[in-house]
Amino acid sequence: MKLSRIALATMLVAAPLAAANAGVTVTPLLLGYTFQDSQHNNGGKDGNLTNGPELQDDLFVGAALGIELTPWLGFEAEYNQVKGDVDGASAGAEYKQKQINGNFYVTSDLITKNYDSKIKPYVLLGAGHYKYDFDGVNRGTRGTSEEGTLGNAGVGAFWRLNDALSLRTEARATYNADEEFWNYTALAGLNVVLGGHLKPAAPVVEVAPVEPTPVAPQPQELTEDLNMELRVFFDTNKSNIKDQYKPEIAKVAEKLSEYPNATARIEGHTDNTGPRKLNERLSLARANSVKSALVNEYNVDASRLSTQGFAWDQPIADNKTKEGRAMNRRVFATITGSRTVVVQPGQEAAAPAAAQ
């Protein structure tokens, strides 16, 4: 009785825990027929039973709870019992055989790899503990019970009805090691799978990396700066522009057109000959001559041009020589500004305007 209580408690505790996982199997009822070994009936290795009383073959009843370890390998904890008559003893003599087993089974899927087949033959190997209780007949000098270790070997098949239910049939031989006798059982049951059968891992498919879609380069906005200088030289006491400098003034006008926000600072200078007042007016007149050329001939907005006369205050050469005085009679202009240009892919930005 104690053995059956342990087995029942183990299954009741394990069942709700196991049900949460795929591949858990429950066989709530195993029915079969056990054939008792004549060696046991005739006394076993120690002659514990007389040659007269015989254990009769009888109904096998059991239950099992298991788990699929792989798609082809499973393990089950099983409890079963056989209750039968003892012939040749006192009237009403009977025996009760109880077992608790741990069995591994391997299905044909190990070889065939046909995991969706409807019929799955299997082989079974396991071990456990058995106990016989006798009522109305003595077991020789050992009293009314015997127990020991057993080993199981069997063949069977799962007949799959659907993904959750299978009919199970099996032929099993049980070797009772302590008494050295065999029992043989033919059994059947309904096998229930909780959460679905285990499936083999899907093959890993290596997906080729997807090359990113090329993104067309976008146009870029760049800022171009303008830094330009102009030098115009004059004759003594003159403010008119010589023809040789007009192309240079035209270049300045062109850049002022290309850079709409550019401005020009125009400075007039003289040598040190003559009165200061005269040279102040002359230096400013020379600056205004360049400004007038830009405004009148090239339509440059006058507000973008500033002029100033410095007389002889900023010489760049020695006024004691003729050559030096010629260098000092000049206009010097600085033109500065910037513009934003859109550069297309593959196109180089224009180089900044060079100083003149």
Curated annotation (Swiss-Prot):
Meso-2,6-diaminopimelate binds at N237, D271, T273, N279, R286. GO terms for cellular component: cell outer membrane; host cell mitochondrion; pore complex. It is found in: Cell outer membrane; Host mitochondrion. Gene3D superfamilies: 2.40.160.20, OmpA-like domain. Disruption phenotype: Significant loss of the bacterial outer membrane, not as able to induce apoptosis as wild-type bacteria in human cell lines. Its main location: membrane. It is a multi-pass membrane protein. One of its GO terms (molecular function) is porin activity. Keywords: Apoptosis, Cell outer membrane, Host mitochondrion, Ion transport, Membrane, Porin, Signal, Transmembrane, Transmembrane beta strand, Transport, Virulence. GO terms for biological process: monoatomic ion transport. Residues 221-339 form the OmpA-like domain. It comes from the Bacteria. Changing D271A: Periplasmic domain no longer binds diaminopimelate. Residues 1-19 form the signal peptide. Homotrimer. Forms a pore with a size of 1.3 nm. Belongs to the outer membrane OOP (TC 1.B.6) superfamily. Functions as a porin. Induces apoptosis in human cell lines through caspase-dependent and AIF-dependent pathways. Purified Omp38 enters host cell and localizes to the mitochondria, which presumably leads to a release of proapoptotic molecules such as cytochrome c and AIF (apoptosis-inducing factor). Binds peptidoglycan, contributes to cell wall maintenance. Live A.baumannii and purified Omp38 elicit identical effects with respect to the induction of apoptosis in human cell lines. The periplasmic domain (residues 221-339) binds peptidoglycan (PGN) and diaminopimelate, one of the components of PGN. This is Outer membrane protein Omp38. It comes from Acinetobacter baumannii (strain ATCC 19606 / DSM 30007 / JCM 6841 / CCUG 19606 / CIP 70.34 / NBRC 109757 / NCIMB 12457 / NCTC 12156 / 81).
